[in-house]
Amino acid sequence: MARICHGFGMTVLAYDQYRNPALDGIVRYVELDELLRTADLISLHCPLTAETHHIINADTIKMIRDNAILVNTSRGGLIDTNALIDALRARKFAGVGLDVYEDEDGQVFEDFSDDVLQNEVVPILMSFPNVVVTSHQAFFTRTALQSIAITTMENARAFARGEKLVNEVKG
């Protein structure tokens, strides 16, 4: 995502506990509050841990500049859904894209076309004209799926050998 945005001439700000040397010259690392205050587009790309749970909440939403775009393709629990809905009702965001959402268990990978949705959040989110909700489709490209398979096998092999896991999520 950073490379794509950089390719379009965007200034790419990043907040991360661990700097990625592969992104040197592409992103400028800043503190979270600076990113929230200055970014026109905020795209979440992090695991769900105790530290990142509700990283976007009522307080952080207040820091986000008006008419920003918020995208979450990582984990639903990164965003406090009730705070997001309140912000959408207040017309805080120009747009929101959600490939994941809080409490989505049992709602994705199944066809509920002929059923009544039990999760009330999805219809509320979809009622906003500036919100797009997809069901874990953002990452389904041939290249991405191949990368997932290779990474999974490499991690399984390293685990079986007692080696350090390169993709271990700490936290």
Write out the residue ranges for each language-model feature.
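Rossmann-like dinucleotide-binding domain for NAD(H)/NADP(H)
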Residues: 67, 77-171
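Conserved catalytic cysteine-centered active-site region
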Residues: 74
